[in-house]
Amino acid sequence: MKEIRGKKLKLLLKEEDIKRRVKELAKEIESSYSWEEPIVVVGLLKGAFIFLADLVRAFDRFVFVEFMQVSSYGKGMKSSGTIKIVKDLDMDIEGKEVLLVDDILDTGLTMKEIHDYLLMKKPKVLKTCVFLDKKERRKVDFNADFVGFEVPDKFLVGYGLDWGEYGRNLPEVYMVED
């Protein structure tokens, strides 16, 4: 059994199930945009980068890729609730069709705040996609337009999600056991 930082890991999502769902999501997303020009896919670093890389490679069309980095976790296992933009967009998204991508939606605070921030930049369309959704942790009324998997309220690692930088590179998603 795998362990991180002295805690056992229990498999939640297998690599093949993740790959299948990412391809399905790409098709769903593709059908929801006009594609008059490539959409701008904005990934939230660091957690979303693996999901985002697989997602954009599953599209049958060209996309522009942008990154933002926000901080709300620190080194713990719970969100601090304070959101800080560490890296902003390099590209102007005014009048563009945009997809905001993150690894996990739990309280909704980060996604809602970044979504509202991006709306101020006047995109033509702004939709959201998350790899994982912990609906039972929601503190604000915010739901993603596209969701990979709904997951239980457990601390998760793998496929981009980490615990103090550990576990991000795992190809599956695991629950950290108490």
Swiss-Prot record:
Q: Which CDD domains match?
A: PRTases_typeI
- Give residues annotated as binding GMP: K134, F155, L156, D162
Pathway, per record = Purine metabolism; IMP biosynthesis via salvage pathway; IMP from hypoxanthine: step 1/1; Purine metabolism; GMP biosynthesis via salvage pathway; GMP from guanine: step 1/1
Indicate the residues that form the catalytic site: D106 (proton acceptor)
Provide the protein's localization.
Cytoplasm
Q: What is this protein called?
A: Hypoxanthine-guanine phosphoribosyltransferase
Pfam families per record: Pribosyltran
Query: Biological process (GO) annotations?
Result: GMP salvage; guanine salvage; hypoxanthine metabolic process; IMP salvage; purine ribonucleoside salvage
Q: Which UniProt keywords apply?
A: Cytoplasm, Glycosyltransferase, Magnesium, Metal-binding, Nucleotide-binding, Purine salvage, Transferase
Q: What is its EC number?
A: 2.4.2.8
Q: Which residues bind Mg(2+)?
A: D103
Q: Which cofactor(s) are needed, names only?
A: Mg(2+)
Q: Name one GO molecular function term.
A: nucleotide binding
